[in-house]
């Protein structure tokens, strides 16, 4: 695995996390939920395919958990967990 590919993966993850942050700040509930799910899927795929190392995975997973905590109860429906 080249260092260049890992940098690209990190940049793509940063972009996905920035999208979540932007949607949360603008109170776009549906878009924030979709961006969260997409980022979670991307993070897990990159980890499974060894495109990111364990340290990077742990760092991004912690950030994703913070977003999950902030998004508790985000829905147009009641009592929905993500």
Where are these predicted regions, by residue range?
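Amphipathic, soluble alpha-helical interaction motifs
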Residues: 19, 23, 42-49, 70, ...
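Helical anchoring/docking segments at protein termini
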Residues: 1-2, 82
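A structural signal for alpha-helical segments
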Residues: 8, 27, 31, 52-55, ...
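Short, charge-rich amphipathic alpha-helical segments embedded
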Residues: 37-60
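N-terminal acidic leader/helix
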Residues: 2-33, 76
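Alpha-helical linker/edge segments of TPR/alpha-solenoid repeat scaffolds
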Residues: 60-82
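Generic structural concept
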Residues: 10, 14-17, 33-40, 61-64, ...
């Amino acid at each position: 695995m080249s260092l260049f590919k890992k940098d690209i993966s990190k940049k793509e993850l940063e972009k996905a996390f920035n999208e979540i942050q932007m949607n949360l700040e603008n109170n776009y509930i549906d878009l924030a939920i979709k961006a969260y799910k997409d980022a979670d899927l991307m993070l897990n795929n990159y980890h499974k395919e060894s495109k990111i190392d364990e340290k990077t995975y742990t760092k991004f997973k912690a950030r994703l958990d913070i977003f999950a905590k902030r998004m508790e109860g985000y829905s147009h429906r009641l009592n929905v967990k993500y």
